[in-house]
Amino acid sequence: MATGTEPPQINTGVHGVSRAAISPRHLRTDRWWIAPAMTAGGLLAFIVYSTWRAFANADYYAAPYVSPFYSPCLAENCAPMRGGPNWEIFGSWWGLSPALLILIFPLGFRLTCYYYRKAYYRGFWASPPACAVAEPHKNYTGETRFPLILQNIHRYFFYAAIPVAAILTYDTVLAFRDEHYEWGHMGLGTLVLLVNIVLIWAYTISCHSCRHIIGGRLKHFSKHPVRYRLWGWVGKLNDRHMLLAWASLISVALADFYVYLLASGAFDDPRFF
């Protein structure tokens, strides 16, 4: 019940008392809304596609290729994969798609990624929608409250993303077989998985958390020349983190879609040798 003695609400963020009072929302003359709109559209398209494929629980293995959405396959209801990463850790009681057991780690890594946070904050929440454009929200709390405070677990998702990328690397090695599991062969699917894993590793290593783990908390780089050299290499990749984020997101979706087409019988895998 209101008593009439409540303290007045003080706006924060761009509407705070310490900020200059500018009546127009922005002074930009370009089409600033195109970038956040395209970002939202791209992320929404991936969300719709990955949700469909994750719950489909079908057409994710076409020897010798396995979809990155389903690897490693940890449930008893996984499709048989000769030599593949199908570990029956979860028994017959697990009746849902096995993709739901593993996708939480790479998706959690991307969801808490510094670049993706910027992308969906702007694209979906308009917080802010673009540089030099005021956000529509009256108050701003940043990432200090639930659920956004959970963004701070990004580093731990990075640790989980490393073994997932390693397993996808193993899948790529297995792709140098034919449909009869004979080694020394390569098809278009091998190339698709190879490009995908290179982009996934590049995106993972270019992560801000990886850069800090390698070169952070050092007072004197001269005393740690190896870490300094690695930090410099990761820093160069970090400059292209946004590009690698989108390239790897597209490549993992294309890799899954290619395996889906093969497994569903749309066409046969073209073989190089």
What role is predicted for each listed range?
Residues 2-273:
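Membrane-embedded alpha-helical bundles that constitute the cytochrome b-like, heme-associated redox core
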